[in-house]
């Protein structure tokens, strides 16, 4: 089977994945698929660092603004949506470029793991029932015991991750239809942390507070409201924190999130990282994509 070539850009938040994705889309006749669990939600633009209108006009983007904030979204949903988007992009002779930071989503798409026929389905059902009886605290303790880190934790995703860990020896690795080139972006920790702090400042200047307040007033308990960028500001709205304290909390949580992202990509995906401050960036990335596609450099 001839596999479909796709480019996947990963790295910590604020590292510049969107800008690189647009650059590659322009250079290699590509379209972008968002691999971010929060960018699927309509009306949540600033806190999710969604591509701006100008950026969306520079390159076609898929899987953003496809859910209402009241709806849930999972790795399973992402795989189904991403597969459809890839098929659509390829059918028009273009290159799919996945840009994202939600490691579980990307791994699910690229590796195609599922609990197949060799697994005792009654055992799976019994284990799932056991997990569903746990409260949130005990469930997340199970995650820690199994050394599982998942982003934007919710119960369904936690239970799924624990199932995969419990029956890892019996997993079937479904043959995927894709041949990915995984491009990792990173740099020195302080460079990334400075970019995160600057991004949070820009978000607040551009209206994040108003966006978060709208979410807090209308849908404070939905899955989308638990995303980094929103929940940190909720204490400010009820007088438990000053705006400066909430802003600092948001920066700190985002830095921790970036660290978890890097840990995930290093441990779970075959990726080599390129420093965004390197003198030959992004040319080195363009060269890698060109080689991957078997294209010659234009003279």
Swiss-Prot record:
Annotated region (Interaction with substrate tRNA), positions in chain: 36-39
Protein task: Catalyzes the transfer of a dimethylallyl group onto the adenine at position 37 in tRNAs that read codons beginning with uridine, leading to the formation of N6-(dimethylallyl)adenosine (i(6)A).
Organism per entry: Streptococcus pyogenes serotype M5 (strain Manfredo)
Cofactor: Mg(2+)
Keywords linked to the UniProt accession: ATP-binding, Magnesium, Nucleotide-binding, Transferase, tRNA processing
Name of encoding gene: miaA
Sites annotated Interaction with substrate tRNA: 102, 128
Molecular function GO labels: ATP binding; tRNA dimethylallyltransferase activity
Superkingdom of the organism of origin: Bacteria
HAMAP family for this protein: IPP_trans
One example of a Gene Ontology biological process annotation: tRNA modification
Keyword tRNA processing among UniProt keywords: yes
Broad enzyme group: transferase
Family indicated by similarity: Belongs to the IPP transferase family.
First and last residue of the signal peptide: none
Catalytic activity: adenosine(37) in tRNA + dimethylallyl diphosphate = N(6)-dimethylallyladenosine(37) in tRNA + diphosphate
Name of the protein: tRNA dimethylallyltransferase
Amino-acid positions noted as binding substrate in the UniProt annotation, renumbered to this chain: 13-18
PANTHER family: TRNA DIMETHYLALLYLTRANSFERASE
Self-association state and partner proteins as the record states: Monomer.
Chain positions recorded as ATP binding sites: 11-18
